[in-house]
Amino acid sequence: MEIFDILLSTILLRPYVFLLLGLYLVAGSFQLGLKRILVFTILAYFIAFISEYTSTRIGIPYGLYHYTGETHGKELFISNVPFMDSLSYSFLGYFSYSLALLIVSPVTRKGWEFELSHPSWYSKKVLFLTSILFVLQDVLIDPVSLRGSRWFLGQIYYYPVEGIYFGVTLSNFLGWFLVGLAIIYSFQKLDYKMGWSREFAGNALMGPVLYFLNMVFILSVTFYIGEYFIGMISLSIFSGLIILTILKVRRALSISAK
């Protein structure tokens, strides 16, 4: 009964995370298949948890930071790490992976549906691009999360030594790149070994749309709490990425019209 209560409390405390998680599972099931997206989720969670566990103790890979424990008893913790924090890496990783696949792979259109033709599931280009896109999400997220006391997130963590990027350490972004690399590399290797991949992948746009919707949410919070300078930098990152994505989709539309 206690486990049920804490799970319910976690959902009520982090409804936006569960909403993104649900949308991620739907999008991922359509694009990768249910088996692959579940494997992706498990891989991402365990890699993320290990990275957070070690960083809060020895500062690797993100640099040293600490969870405040403010939400202890209100949400599920695994050791000193909030369960939902590590779990969020799964959908942030997939959103980045899906956008990287869209940018790199050939795109075809059938009516209103866009699909990837011969997706670059295992390419190094997708691996590194995903990791970069993964970091760029955190460039928007972390400065706002660090100011969680000013919105409904709460002050859930802090850096003992204030970082150069609006309080966030540069080692944090390096850590996100390495963890993103580890998640996608592990998934690519396992996916290839098990032979689960598909020659075509439908639902090519839902993952990228969710990538940008998450950014819109973070941008909204950034401006809501009055961090306009951070917001303008984040908005420029968002704008550059969405323009690149729109150009790729327009190219697919023009090819299908010929």
Spans of model-derived segments:
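Aromatic-rich, lipid-facing transmembrane alpha helices and their immediate juxtamembrane interface loops
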Residues: 1-258
